[in-house]
């Protein structure tokens, strides 16, 4: 009924219109409301609501559930007329057809709601499974394929038989639905298959035209897996993997790619496909890859020294920053990133923009340009220090001044994102300062050290992490020369400084690349700034993939 559909749409629209008032009325989190809005605005959900309305409109009920008895009465009446009328004789013949009788029987069963399957016989001989398989248990499955075309199936040996181990999602066999995991392959085109999985794979790969398989069905009920999406944190090439059961069935991917996991039944090999589309393939499971990574020695260049953020930071830097070193040790001890589960969210504004990069690569310049470009939308924190203010300094303009004792107490309480000491004075960024900028309705722009991202990467701060990558050595030297000539900078960097910047940039990328949402090579400040602006605008118009822990 059109009215019901209209009522359904109006009700959903009313809920959407009132989502804005829910945080004040219920205390609901902003991210949860964004997720709820995305679900309710989904075309699939709206279609389901309409379908529900249609199904609720009219409940169809059978007129009667004893049509077989009715037909028998009709046949008795027709028996007297059949000799006199050819039409009556033809009707009697139709009503006695086996197919028509089966149709009526099925109708009566559905009408009387007799859906239960009879229980198995309690007297079944337990030795039945050891008896020869009856001929009617064997199935013949026909497949048409071209030579070299993959079926999308792998095999294992079980009890001397070749059994289907997995069916690749999206492959030919999965699309046809004729074979199932656990089916035993007996023959291919009339030839016994033996017990060599590789030989069977080669036989099926080279076959063309009509391929007839004789199988013993497993009758296993397939289960519907939940949708799982992951972001990959390593490169994988199945052609170079000696452990994969079938190299041709593997799925190649690079760090940063988004995959949909379609099957996790195997402890070592998952089935996945790229979210952009394409066929599914095998990838190493989290467990298998963790075992392999455990034997790889960690790059010593990435190990923090003495609690500082980066052992290569120049001694000339004003502040040698540290951040929550007790938590840092905990993070590093358990950090072995393989796959990160993510969820797709509708467009929304991030609360923080975190700029990561080597010293002197231009992070602070980009931060200042962004805030000057749109001060109503972007803001930043004011650092705290324990030193005494100079005569020209005012509280909150450049620094917030507190006593050393107060600052040390707050550091011990974990209230600082990062902190350090320079010339006997403490400097640091309070976490509450970030909360204050976010509460004012602005995006908090931070140019922090890489390890601080580990603290910020939560549902509270939902950061957008941008890595400002140093260009190559020659480009960096030319940029410094141009800055000196134009008067933008008065500091001439030595070759050692420039090489240190390039090397530090590479180390940060290797050690923290899995946290980055975007990487920009800063070979031209104006161009990099425009690219950063474009990326921030896209967040307001395009769906985003975020860690699943931010959503659930």
Curated annotation (Swiss-Prot):
Residue numbers carrying Phosphothreonine: 117
Modified residues (Phosphoserine): 42, 121
Family: Belongs to the MAGUK family.
SH3 domain sequence ranges: 225-293
Subunit field text: Can homomultimerise. Interacts with CACNG2. Interacts (via the SH3-Guanylate kinase-like sub-module) with DLG4/PSD95 and DLGAP1/GKAP. Interacts (via the PDZ domain) with CADM1 (via C-terminus). Interacts with KCNN2/SK2 (via N-terminal domain). Interacts with SRC.
InterPro entries in alphabetical order: GK/Ca_channel_bsu, Guanylate_kin-like_dom, Guanylate_kinase_CS, L27_C, L27_dom, L27_dom_sf, MAGUK, MPP2_SH3
Gene expressing this chain: Mpp2
Domain Guanylate kinase-like: 350-537
UniProt-listed PANTHER family: MEMBRANE-ASSOCIATED GUANYLATE KINASE MAGUK
Record's keyword terms, sorted: Cell projection, Cytoplasm, Cytoskeleton, Membrane, Phosphoprotein, SH3 domain, Synapse
PTM info: Phosphorylated by SRC.
Keyword Chloroplast: no
One Pfam short name: SH3_2
Top-level taxon: Eukaryota
Transmembrane segments: none
Function recorded in the entry: Postsynaptic MAGUK scaffold protein that links CADM1 cell adhesion molecules to core components of the postsynaptic density. In CA1 pyramidal neurons, required for synaptic KCNN2-containing channel function and long-term potentiation expression. Seems to negatively regulate SRC function in epithelial cells.
Protein name: MAGUK p55 subfamily member 2
Protein localization: Cell projection, Dendrite; Postsynaptic density; Cytoplasm, Cytoskeleton; Membrane
L27 domain residues: 8-59, 60-118
GO cellular component entries: cell-cell junction; cytoplasm; cytoskeleton; dendrite membrane; dendritic shaft; dendritic spine; glutamatergic synapse; plasma membrane
Signal peptide: none
Organism encoding this protein: Rattus norvegicus (Rat)
Residues of the PDZ domain: 140-219
Annotated tissue distribution: Expressed in hippocampal neurons.
Single GO MF annotation: transmembrane transporter binding
GO biological process, one term: excitatory postsynaptic potential
